[in-house]
């Protein structure tokens, strides 16, 4: 096997492993199901995990190829992205399934402008994808009762569950907000009551992935 083919296979293997680990992570965040637990990951739930891994890896891939194609434009030799799988679900500890991805520059970059172009291209490309993913996520929010499918124990409180279930709960945490999130919440979400509680965003993968 020639070195080029071996290198491509290595990148494909890392991507495949990262797709697997991020899909498992999606199941863990959405449904609190872990591979080795009393509430295991079935094939049905594994397929649902792609709702997390596809937007996350889509964002990550476009980000890295933004760097890659900018480098090619400037005739700077770089590698394909190295995806980094990171999954701790086997010990019951949720992660997003990856530590990201990197490309390696194999040439001396001769100017600050080239460095700047290569550096900025990734975030700009990824930001465009993030906008699309968030737009889809906010325009396809399920009814507020969806949370009872994940947390049936909330149902006794009705849609006012947030006033009760997080009190005196040391494990309760919430995802912080951003200006972009607030914009989509205010102007894109079809109905305010469909916007998930900050404690529950982890179950809404198209939003959580970005």
Show the residue positions of the predicted features:
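Hydrophobic transmembrane alpha-helices and their immediate loop junctions
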Residues: 1-210
């Amino acid at each position: 096997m020639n070195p080029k083919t071996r290198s491509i296979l290595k990148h494909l293997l890392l991507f495949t492993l990262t797709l697997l680990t991020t899909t498992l992570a999606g199941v863990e965040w959405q449904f609190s199901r872990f591979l080795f637990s009393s509430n295991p990951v079935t094939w049905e739930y594994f397929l649902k995990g792609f709702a997390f891994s596809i937007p996350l890896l889509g964002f990550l891939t476009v980000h890295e190829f933004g760097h890659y194609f900018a480098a090619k434009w400037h005739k700077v030799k770089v590698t394909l992205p190295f995806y980094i799988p990171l999954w701790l679900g086997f010990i019951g500890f949720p992660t997003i399934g990856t530590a990201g991805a990197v490309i390696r520059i194999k040439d001396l970059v001769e100017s600050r402008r080239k460095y700047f172009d290569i550096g900025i291209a990734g975030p700009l490309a990824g930001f465009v994808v993030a906008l699309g993913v968030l737009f889809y996520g906010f325009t396809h929010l399920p009814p507020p009762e969806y949370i009872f499918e994940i947390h049936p124990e909330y149902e006794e409180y009705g849609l006012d569950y947030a006033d009760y279930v997080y009190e005196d709960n040391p494990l309760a945490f919430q995802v912080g907000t951003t200006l972009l999130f607030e914009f989509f919440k205010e102007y894109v979400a079809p109905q305010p009551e469909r916007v998930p509680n900050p404690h529950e965003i982890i179950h809404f993968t198209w939003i959580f992935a970005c």
